[in-house]
Regions:
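Short, conserved phosphate-binding/catalytic loop or strand-edge motifs used
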Residues: 121-132, 198
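A generic, well-ordered mixed alpha/beta core segment in the N-terminal half of proteins
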Residues: 86-118, 125-127
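Aromatic- and glycine-enriched pocket-lining scaffold segments that form the walls
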Residues: 170-183
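Active-site-proximal loop->helix
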Residues: 53, 103-107, 130, 180
Length: 256
């Protein structure tokens, strides 16, 4: 697996590597699967962040600890706020409690949700009291983290009137926002992102769908260097495909 440790001196002349699904795509589709329970996911990421999110969604306890998983903290905060008449406390590691989440909390509260700080204002841990939103438009500064934007965009189809998100300031990590919109469109949700405006229509149900997460080819870049620096090493990379077949890429002994 891509998470295994490979030491150069212990490598054989031929190695096989299986690539798991993209973490970014996996985390987004997991939230949507919790909203629309007729989504089946193939090739889910094996990353710690995705495992934490998946476990938390399948075991919605009153106290949720995401450890170091930053994406889980942000996506879960938005999702849990929509679960009416339920109360949650979401926390993480000491390092997680130093990572700001104020912009997302302010946006959720401005929509009518109920999210409170338990310690330092602007930072986890949080108390979330699931409720119904009162408004369908929010202004969000987008220069800090695109994950705040994606967190709101992912819950938007479950809201009675959908959601309009007006982005202020420079939009960072725009490709990740585009990814979120693309996934929504792929499962049948009407969502658009034009200039500084995201518009997501309310969606009560979607057609049954089998969602294949793209393999995380970016994680393979480290192994390219390993092959280039190791004599007589061949590496076969297996990529998940819809027909349960695999594509094998055999790298040359030297890339230099």
């Amino acid at each position: 697996a891509a998470s295994d440790v490979y030491k150069r001196q212990n490598l054989k002349s031929y190695c096989e590597l299986d690539i798991s699904g993209s973490k970014s795509e996996s985390n987004r589709i997991l939230i949507l699967k919790s909203i629309f329970n007729n989504i089946k996911i193939n090739n889910l990421s094996s990353s710690d962040d995705t495992s934490v999110l998946n476990h938390s969604l399948q075991n919605l306890n009153e106290n949720i600890d995401v450890g170091h998983a930053g994406t889980s903290m942000r996506f879960l905060t938005a999702y849990l706020a929509t679960l009416e008449n339920k109360k949650f406390i979401i926390s993480g590691s000491d390092r997680m409690h130093q990572r700001p989440i104020g912009l997302l909390v302010d946006a959720l509260n401005s929509l009518g949700f109920k999210v409170n700080y338990l310690k330092k204002r602007g930072f986890p841990p949080l108390e979330i009291i699931g409720s119904k939103n009162l408004h369908h438009e929010v202004v969000l500064k987008s220069h800090i983290s695109s994950q705040f934007v994606s967190a709101l965009t992912l819950i938007a189809p479950s809201l009675d009137n959908g959601l309009r998100i007006i982005l202020q300031d420079d939009i960072i990590s725009k490709p990740y926002i585009n990814m979120t919109i693309s996934i929504l469109n792929k499962i049948g949700v009407d969502a658009t992102f034009e200039k500084n405006l995201i518009n997501v229509k309310p969606t009560k149900k979607i057609n049954d769908i089998i969602y294949d997460v793209e393999s995380d080819w970016s994680s393979v870049s480290y192994f390219f260097s390993m092959v280039a620096l190791t004599k007589n090493l061949k590496l076969s990379i297996s990529d998940y495909k819809k027909a349960v077949s695999y594509t094998h890429l055999t790298l040359p002994t030297r890339l230099l």
